[in-house]
Curated annotation (Swiss-Prot):
Mn(2+) 2 binds at D15, S65, D439, H440. Substrate binds at H126, R156, D157, R188, R194, R258, P259, D260, R261, K331. This is 2,3-bisphosphoglycerate-independent phosphoglycerate mutase. The active site is at S65 (phosphoserine intermediate). The lineage of its organism: Bacteria, Bacillati, Cyanobacteriota, Cyanophyceae, Oscillatoriophycideae. It comes from the Bacteria. The gene is gpmI.
Amino acid sequence: MANAPVSPVVLVILDGWGYRQEANANAIAAANTPNVDAFFATYPSTLIHTSGKRVGLPDGQMGNSEVGHLNLGAGRVVPQELVRISDAIEDGSFLRNDVLVKVCRETRQAGKKLHLIGLCSDGGVHSHLNHLLGLLDLAKVNGIADVHIHAITDGRDTNTTEGINYLQQIQAHIDKFGVGSISTISGRYFAMDRDRRWDRVKQAYDVMTQNGNLDQRSFAEILQSHYDNGVTDEFIPPVRLKEGAIEPGDGVIFYNFRPDRARQLSYALVDKNFQGFERELIPDLNFVTFTQYDANLPVQVAFAPQNLTKILGEVIADNGLKQFRTAETEKYPHVTYFFNGGLEVAFEGEDRELISSPQVATYDQKPEMSAKAVTDAACQAIEKGIYSLVVINYANPDMVGHTGKLEAAVQAIETVDHCLGRLVATIGKMGGTTLITADHGNAEYMADQNGKSWTAHTTNPVPFILIEGERRKVVGHGADVVLRENGCLADVAPTILDILGIDKPQEMTGQSLIAPAPYAVTRRR
């Protein structure tokens, strides 16, 4: 006799779908969303926190996709690398970090150059300006005179033309302490691609690893010229200001702490089997990354990864249940690597499907992205009737929100709403329960108070909607399930375990978002 189909719990992550009451510059409010509107009107919902200390970041710091998925999968507030590194600088232990001191000492003794690569902003998503300034202080203390900064401009996690101000702050620090020079500039569109668009990465790689062909203008003149022509920080074409190429035996510190957008350039610089584009390997680089970008990278890591145990994926596997993850390229690492606490490998019984993101320069050109294909993959997996947990990410609100184009963001929201209608119907047909939430805000705030396009994330809360399925009811509740207020992302994994009837491990400090029933009820799941 065949086993009955499994009725899953499906976690749907609407990346960048925040909540904001004001309708102005709000793509979500402006969009036609009949499905989400019906969900809010019909099913229990609440708002949860996705920023600041509630997700392991400094107070007031906006959340991001990496942090969001770490907290979602871990079931606890995970102290973030931004805080770890900033605290080390503040308490002085940064200057005693064994890996950082070692690369400085060996670079000085060999008479080589020290290169500092990273995103130059205070966005706090991939890097922080204070960390670069801390590295300049480290170089000064260790007597390194030849220090070259390969600046990556932001314009995505910050205002679009703030780059000139950040570089001026760096230059002021250089002038004050007498160490370092801004040798190259590359927009993050080139240096921090994560979708194997190697033609972009090659342009950044070339300016960092070659000499000659210098732009004689100051960095301020270069950036202002681009701003005047409508080119913002994210898209600044790679340019070389001073001689200072990365050469054999040099020391290199890549100070981004978030891995996903630092991997490709790192592989280009150190991987002997690299095939992204034609280049000769630069031998004997003394290469350090702030955090572990990839376990297979032949580099030293200054801040070793935290070991998270008994996370959601692991608990599901330990209970002999199968799970499925899917997203398109832009968010695939988030539902796999980050959701699994920084583990590259899948758990036993964890299946994955990667959907390719469209090959366009910016996603306002195709706001629907690959949402339909993601929905197809999710529905097919759900209909197999073998998965107890399904995790899906829709990238559209975040990726199109980052373009700052309101009309395109509205189209992105409407695309996702349409897909949700089909997805939730499929889950319902299988008797499953749907949890709809987001990892952080973005698309609900597309322009600042001055009307200038806003391309960064927000600190707004996000929705959490619970749609019970007939064969996956919440245990111990009657007809009405009540969701508590003031929750956070760390509470989602315990909620899933609550619905599945699995005991929460003590390592999970989050609490189920399902409020205790006011009276005892026995109910079939």
